[in-house]
């Protein structure tokens, strides 16, 4: 068994997990249903989330892990970060909150035996003019100076939380990333936990019509499981491994449980409802596990930490997989 397969064995034993996009532009946007009509400071929004109740719901369903977004494109982070503030010039509370939401989530999930993985990006806070200029995340290809700065932000989080962060799922790694640049992230992710599992989302980027915009780059030599992002579930692993660059890593698939809008079939991330019946999802998750793979489902979670009830009806059946 390869090092990556050994390192991810705990994930196979836990079988499946959830993915949560807890982002300021969603849960603090009064036009979005998940915000419950509220717009406050970022700190107040984070304090509205009941981490214990959220963890209890996952435990009720038997989830093994939760992948939680630290940020996505905007300046707003999920926890304090002195490195980020120093680079950007933002004061505490302006981009990085004063409250440590990640620590709160760790404590709640730890009580029910659920692992926490963090979502990070490869393109940084590129939608915020001040942060974009400070980091140099202009795109489309990353500059070494940006990678050094952005990896330093991840390193601070990794060192703070140590072994409580079981892994990292990194998005936006499509083009321009070399093994040398990827190593900076891998070293940062494992600074606090040498056994942290890693997946980098390197697949080709598609537009809303399904046209390939960029070609996938070769697999990351530091990945332990496949990023697995896909629109429709249904694929199955062969003997639990995905082979990238001749190296076996854990086969993993990730997609959204929610119902997308009719005009955009890939737009179901974080949406309510379920595209799949409980019976279908049970059979699919069971088949993946029997073949050595793992499954992560993106779910709809409100600002207060409550999971969409239709999705909970699906998740509950997975406890017996």
Question: Across the structure, where does each feature detected by a protein language model lie?
Answer:
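Mature catalytic domains of secreted/periplasmic carbohydrate-active enzymes
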Residues: 1-321
């Amino acid at each position: 068994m390869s090092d990556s397969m050994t390192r991810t064995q705990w994930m196979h034993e836990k079988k499946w997990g959830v993915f949560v996009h807890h982002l300021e532009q969603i849960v603090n946007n009064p036009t979005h249903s998940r915000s419950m009509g509220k717009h406050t400071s970022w700190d107040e929004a984070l304090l509205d989330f009941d981490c214990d109740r959220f963890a209890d719901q996952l435990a009720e369903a038997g989830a093994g892990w939760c992948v939680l977004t630290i940020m996505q494109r905007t300046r707003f982070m999920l926890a304090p970060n002195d490195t980020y503030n120093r680079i950007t010039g933002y004061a505490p509370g302006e981009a990085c909150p004063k409250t440590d939401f990640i620590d709160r989530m760790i404590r709640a999930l730890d009580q029910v035996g659920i692992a926490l993985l963090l979502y990070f990006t490869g393109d940084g806070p590129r939608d915020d003019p001040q942060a974009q200029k400070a980091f140099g995340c202009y795109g489309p290809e990353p500059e070494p100076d940006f990678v050094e700065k952005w990896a330093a932000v991840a390193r601070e989080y990794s060192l703070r939380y140590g072994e409580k962060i079981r892994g990292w799922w990194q998005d936006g790694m499509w083009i321009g990333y070399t093994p040398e640049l990827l190593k900076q992230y891998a070293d940062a992710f494992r600074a606090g936990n040498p056994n942290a599992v890693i997946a980098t989302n390197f697949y080709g980027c598609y537009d809303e019509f399904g046209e390939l915009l960029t070609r996938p780059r070769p697999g990351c030599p530091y990945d332990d499981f496949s990023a697995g992002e896909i629109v429709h579930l249904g694929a199955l692993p062969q003997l639990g491994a995905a082979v990238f660059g001749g190296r076996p890593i854990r086969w993993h698939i990730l997609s959204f449980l929610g119902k997308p809008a009719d005009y955009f079939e890939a737009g179901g991330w974080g949406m309510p409802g379920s595209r799949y019946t409980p019976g279908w999802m049970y059979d699919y998750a069971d088949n993946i596990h029997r073949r050595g793979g793992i499954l992560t489902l993106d779910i709809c979670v409100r600002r207060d930490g409550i999971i969409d009830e239709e999705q909970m009806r699906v998740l509950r059946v997975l406890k017996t997989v």
